[in-house]
């Protein structure tokens, strides 16, 4: 290789490296926590990450699984995460219980217009309607959005004397199948799949969706820390735009969303 050609090639390579480094240096890091484990709805976030939409928006996004909306709200408030996906009821509860908290998260975009929470029981238990839940033992993780909103469900349907049992998320459906609890709360799409994995057919489950039983609540929203909102609103706008692009793709091509979750 001639010296001039070598120098030209080297210069081009260095320029490309410099451009890449500059892009990496200007990328805004964002730690994002989901409300739950990696499963179907996670595709809405994992797809734009896999497709590079966040990267194209000059964002360095890290997406972690969660263990309930309440936990996500708390972690964004603590500064451990910049943004997250959480049930709006859990966010409102945090604001009500922590009026003087210096970093109360705020919602910037609705993802679920209605809460997907429901009460679920096995048909063989004899539970058919909300009235049958009075005095029964219900189970859900402490941070579960359905559990936290259950007082509204109970008031709307005259349920009294329900007792609660807490457990780790992977044990919720197992305890229902074993008969350790009479009913559970959770997001319908999550619990039905988990019950199916434990040998329970969908037709053998009584599902009482909150929106159909007097609980008119928004569902999950993207939440952000006030610190990030104040210091870098452009990054939040870029995140939401990339997210919306990913959502459109998942809706148009669900198989691509499944691949992103896998």
Which role fits each region the language model picked out?
Residues 88-90, 171-175, 179-262:
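Pocket-lining segment of extracytoplasmic ligand-binding domains
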Residues 25-178, 182-189, 208-210, 215-216:
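Short, glycine-/small- and polar/acidic-enriched structural segments
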Residues 15-16, 42:
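Extended rod-forming repeat segments used as scaffolds/tethers
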């Amino acid at each position: 290789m001639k010296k001039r050609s070598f120098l030209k090639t080297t210069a081009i390579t260095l320029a490309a490296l410099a451009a890449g480094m500059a892009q990496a240096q200007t990328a805004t890091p964002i730690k994002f926590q989901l409300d739950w484990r990696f499963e179907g709805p996670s595709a809405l976030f994992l797809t734009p990450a896999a497709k590079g939409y966040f990267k194209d928006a000059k964002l360095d996004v890290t997406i972690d699984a969660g263990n309930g909306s309440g936990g996500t709200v708390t972690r964004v408030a603590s500064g451990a995460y910049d943004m997250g996906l959480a049930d709006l009821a859990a966010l409102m509860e945090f604001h009500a219980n922590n009026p003087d908290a210096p970093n109360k998260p705020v919602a910037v975009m609705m993802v679920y217009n209605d809460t997907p929470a429901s009460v679920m029981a096995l048909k063989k238990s004899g539970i058919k309607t909300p009235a049958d839940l009075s005095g029964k033992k219900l189970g859900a993780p402490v941070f579960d959005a359905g559990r936290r909103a259950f007082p509204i469900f109970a008031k709307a349907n005259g349920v009294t004397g329900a007792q609660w049992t807490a457990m780790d998320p992977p044990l919720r459906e197992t305890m229902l199948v074993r008969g350790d609890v009479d009913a559970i709360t959770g997001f319908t799409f999550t619990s039905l799949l988990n019950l199916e994995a434990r040998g329970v057919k969908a037709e053998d489950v009584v599902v009482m969706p909150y929106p159909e039983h007097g609980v008119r609540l928004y569902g999950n929203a993207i939440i952000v820390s006030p610190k990030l909102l104040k210091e870098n609103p452009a990054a939040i706008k870029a995140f939401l735009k990339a997210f919306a692009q990913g959502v459109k793709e998942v809706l148009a091509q669900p198989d691509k969303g499944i691949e992103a979750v896998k």
